[in-house]
A protein has these predicted regions:
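FAD-binding subdomain of flavoenzyme oxidoreductases
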Residues: 111-115, 124-126, 130-253
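General beta-strand structural signal in soluble alpha/beta enzymes
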Residues: 26-30, 61-62, 82-86, 93, ...
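Short amphipathic alpha-helices in soluble, non-transmembrane regions
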Residues: 13-17, 75, 244-250, 294-308, ...
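Short, conserved charged micro-motifs
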Residues: 67-70, 132, 238-244, 293-301, ...
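Conserved glycine-rich FAD pyrophosphate-binding loop
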Residues: 3-4, 85-87, 95-101, 107, ...
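A conserved active-site cap/scaffold subdomain adjacent to cofactor or substrate pockets
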Residues: 235-237, 248, 255-257, 265-313
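N-terminal flexible segment immediately upstream of the FAD-binding catalytic core
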Residues: 1-73, 89-120, 264-275, 316, ...
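Short beta-strand-to-loop capping motifs
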Residues: 63, 233-237, 287-293, 348-354, ...
């Protein structure tokens, strides 16, 4: 049941929040409330227009699960909406408070509780930064299966709640492929209840924007660490680069963490990389993370497709230099494009797994939108199926034209996860019934992130 929700104008409630977590962890000034009510929806001009005036009444940063529980209880008692926020790196307004209320910052709940090298699992609080988990895991010979390009700032809870996949998805799949072993979830009730979700039960909170409960602890699967080296290959045309990337994706002789394909002039937008090597603006570039010692052989394979290795970095420099190639992959590709031209935005597209169909889809769309569409492809495994996942860059010509392009993608058989809506149920990746059932049982008043589902 959803009831009419109230703005936080109750000074007694704010006083109780201050007494609970301390003055410095409660934000009521306009600037802070705006900052913590904004995520990376600015990648979308549609969302920017729709969400820019959505601001919380108060922002609170609990320092313990007990404090979090008491905040939630107070909110329910006062019938106030609660929006949980990680680092605010989501792109669809996942952590934007559509109906004001309280934004809860999870950044202080940032403890790696356990890291077991035998079971290859980590127990973490939701505010743990993914980069911190990755670095700690690598010290013990393990690594995170997949992570977003925002890994140095994004929280694990935010990634699980609003993400998909990323670096590593070419070998380990996405969030749905066993990365989340279990999680502890708190309900939004006067007396919050706790549930431990395992196996298929975790589907109710993966990519659910927090509407089906508040994660307080996660158990994450890890994989054996690999010494990764990085390389950039250049190709004369997009088709050759796509043929190479697809072949490399399927070639089990090579271990890959990243295969990112960018048609020209996208790679020219990557300023830190171009400070080391001036990339040819007319070439299609493929960014790779490969197991130590494999760059030479992969470069040989690339020659069969007209490709040349133009830059490489050894494994002992991985994550230890000013940038990594992952800083130019996934939606960081879009970020660098927007820095070069603020008129750019993007789409999220799942192309056909069968190569000839995939290539025909790309060719058709490029013919329809030769001046408006720049292809950016990442290769991922979804379950056991290789899927070219596109984040094509789009020259924004207005909302009507944007949705004409989306219609054209879908007419070509390309599945679009629309990044220009905040509605969870508009995303084909959402889990449907498990999320709805989780919301009914753990968010009975509809106070958690209202308006998203």
């Amino acid at each position: 049941m959803t009831t009419a929700q109230q703005p936080v104008t109750n000074t007694d409630l704010i006083l109780r929040l201050r007494n609970l977590v301390g003055d410095k962890h409660v934000y009521t000034n306009a600037k802070a409330r705006k900052v913590f009510s904004t995520d990376a929806y600015t990648f979308s001009p549609v969302l920017t227009e729709a969400l820019q005036d959505k601001v919380a009444d108060v922002v609170v940063a609990p320092g313990s699960v007990s404090e979090l529980e008491q905040i939630v209880s107070l909110a329910v008692q006062h019938n106030v909406p609660v929006t949980i926020r990680g680092a605010g790196t989501g792109n669809y307004g996942q952590s934007v408070p559509l109906e004001a209320g309280i934004v809860v910052l999870m950044r202080r709940l940032n403890t790696i509780l356990e890291l077991d090298v035998t079971t290859k699992r980590a127990k973490v609080q939701p505010g743990v930064i993914i980069g911190a988990l990755e670095r700690r895991a690598r010290e013990l010979g393990l690594e995170v299966p997949c992570y977003p390009s925002t890994w140095n700032t994004a929280t694990i809870g935010g990634f699980v709640s609003g993400g998909f996949g990323g670096v590593g998805s070419i070998r380990n799949g996405t969030l749905w492929d066993g990365m989340v072993v279990s999680c502890e979830v708190m309900s939004a009730e006067v007396t919050p209840q706790y549930s431990t979700l395992t196996d298929a039960e975790v589907l109710s909170v993966i990519h659910a924007y927090g509407v089906s409960g508040i994660m307080t602890e996660l158990e994450i699967s890890l994989v054996d660490a690999v010494a990764w080296e990085e390389a950039v290959l250049a190709f004369d045309d997009l088709t050759s680069a796509l043929r190479f990337g697809y072949a490399l994706s399927l070639d089990e002789a090579f271990d890959k963490r990243l295969i990112c394909t960018c048609e020209p002039p996208i790679a020219g937008f990557f300023r830190p990389l171009n400070n080391e090597i001036s990339l040819n603006a007319t070439k299609t570039h493929v960014l790779l993370e490969l197991a130590q010692g494999q760059t030479e052989a992969v470069s040989g394979l690339a020659q069969d497709y007209g490709g040349t290795c133009v830059w490489q970095r050894p494994s002992d420099k991985y994550h230890k230099s000013g940038f990594s190639l992952s800083d130019f992959s996934w939606n960081h590709t879009t970020l660098w494009a927007m820095k070069a031209n603020p008129n750019y935005t993007y789409l999220q597209a799942m192309f056909a797994s069968e190569f000839d169909t995939f290539l025909a889809q790309v060719d058709s769309l490029k013919q329809q939108f030769p001046e408006e569409l720049l292809m950016h492809l990442e290769y991922v495994y979804i379950g056991d199926k290789l899927t070219p996942s596109g984040l094509p860059i789009v020259s924004y010509q207005g909302k009507t034209r944007l949705y004409e392009m989306i219609d054209a993608f879908e007419a070509a058989g390309v599945e679009i996860a629309d990044p220009h809506t905040w509605r969870l149920d508009a995303d084909p990746r959402w889990n449907g019934t498990p999320v709805v059932d989780g919301k009914a049982s753990r968010n009975p008043l509809g106070l958690l992130n209202p308006g998203k589902l």
